[in-house]
Amino acid sequence: MYETPAGWLSSLHPIIDGEVCEDRHHEWGFTIYRTEYGPSTDHPWQRLLQMIQTHAHKATLRVNGVTDDDPVFQQLWSLFRLDAQADTALSGLNVDQLRLLYNNSNGNLPPMNTDFPLHRIFLVADDVTFADAEPSTIKAVDGDYRAENYIPRNNWNGGQRYFGWMPMRAHEVVEMWKHLDYDCLDRIAPPTIKGSHLVIWENDCY
């Protein structure tokens, strides 16, 4: 499935008071929180960020079917941002605590996509991420998840299947962004099995 840089740019126009603002664009990308700290994770964290950035650039070129010198692509890529949040105050926070932080940040620069429906997702690099010598698996977390909306009335179909997040490959953030253009995370995420996330999401369209 291919996109065009112009079409992608048009999807980034903000809507204010019901009107599309064609002279403005949202930045696109994700906030990523680091929750594991210590000397052994400092360099892997930097390598993880660089890997995400590098693969995002390549994937954006590939999805658009263009080369790096395309002026519309250059405008699109200039709007990409990986908002890396690393502070020892985040150490050990779980996805529910991070979701509260994401939704209640009162700083001058709010997390990415808090005002961008369908893309209200953030990323997490935690102890599971840094258990690998070369971190490659992160969590994608639904900023709008409410557990009561996903608890089934009975367990005939195996109980609750979605818990507001999914594991994913860190090199596929662009592909996930494109999936989010059309679907919510609860439809994208692989179903859990007895509450366990046994399947890591991987792109199958872009």
How would you describe each model-predicted region?
Residues 1-163:
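Extended, charge-biased low-complexity segments
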Residues 149-206:
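Acidic, proline/glycine-rich low-complexity IDRs
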